[in-house]
Amino acid sequence: MAELLRSLRDSQLVARFQRRCGLFPAREASGEEHVVKNYFYYYLFRFSAALGQEVFYITFLPFTHWNIDPNLSRRLVVIWVLVMYIGQVAKDILKWPRPSFPPVVRLEKRIIAEYGMPSTHAMAATAISFTLLISTMDRYQYPFILGLMMAVVFSTLVCLSRLYTGMHTVLDILGGVLITAVLIALTYPAWTLIDSLDSASPLFPVCVIVVPFLLCYNYPVSDYYSPTRADTTTIVAAGAGVTLGFWINHFFQLVSKPTPSLPVIQNIPPLTTDMLVLGLTKFMVGIMLILLVRQLVQKLSLQVLFSWFKVVTRNKEARRRLEIEVPYKFVTYTSVGICATTFVPMLHRFLGLL
């Protein structure tokens, strides 16, 4: 078993996969970082890698909430936040390095400073795809085999993209998938509780804010700075904001037509041009408001924190300090989550888009 685990952590295994897919290191004299000999795999896995990054989740999850099913989006967000927090913390506790360069070709630079085990891209992709499958199979009428195939293909492409980009070993990916499978199995009995969070007691908002903030503020200390803590705070804060937004809607009765709780069997309506235009309009309106709120709250929170701690405003290194980074990220993305679930639907209603 130990020999098998060592072989799965071997960087040469990742390098061989890259070579099979047409990705090679460039010669030093060429001035290039890598050579691509198969652009089909290059674009396939670069696109697949994007499916596990922030740009996908800040588009897919809001789109699901505004156009498909708010209850489904809440469940997806809660599970996503849970697996991502555990995965990010596990990275900084285990401190396993990423595949070595050389022989591996690295296509991503931003997260090189992070540790590798487990792959949070693999965890997020597996969590989103299979939570979506499990949550919809008793709510919408569609061929289960088709849904299962789509979930497997989605998560597999994201996992393979982490090998292609040189960011993870095979063991990192298998570990991420296994951890996610265990978390889904353990939390599944409590999924109905997630659906009733909006009817919790008036003290619920305090817990939703205080507990996630403390989890982020007491994040494991790394040997050197990496974006892991900031990314984790962003994810956890967004989840707290979404959960709080649902509670606000219920407590203040801001939802004019309550959505039925899961599960309710429904037919998937056919996609028409009018539905597509309406959905894209709601999405664009919502995203613009979210970006506006994000920009305003981030700027205001940074100004307050810089003033409080007497820090030079344009000092980029100051943003990385624990007492500044966590509060400003948390306030910003909690506001984004509340905006997405409360103010955007109100704007949609005002504009006649509901």
From Swiss-Prot:
Keywords attached to this Swiss-Prot or TrEMBL record, sorted alphabetically, are: Endoplasmic reticulum, Hydrolase, Lipid metabolism, Membrane, Transmembrane, Transmembrane helix
* Chief place of localization: endoplasmic reticulum
Q: Does the keyword Zinc apply?
A: no
In the UniProt entry, which residues are flagged as the active site? 121, 168
Cellular component GO terms held in the UniProt record: endoplasmic reticulum membrane
Give the span(s) annotated as Phosphatase sequence motif III: 161-172
Task: Name the chain's protein.
Answer: Sphingosine-1-phosphate phosphatase 2
- Protein source organism: Mus musculus (Mouse)
* Organism taxonomic ancestry: Eukaryota, Metazoa, Chordata, Craniata, Vertebrata
Encoding gene (name): Sgpp2
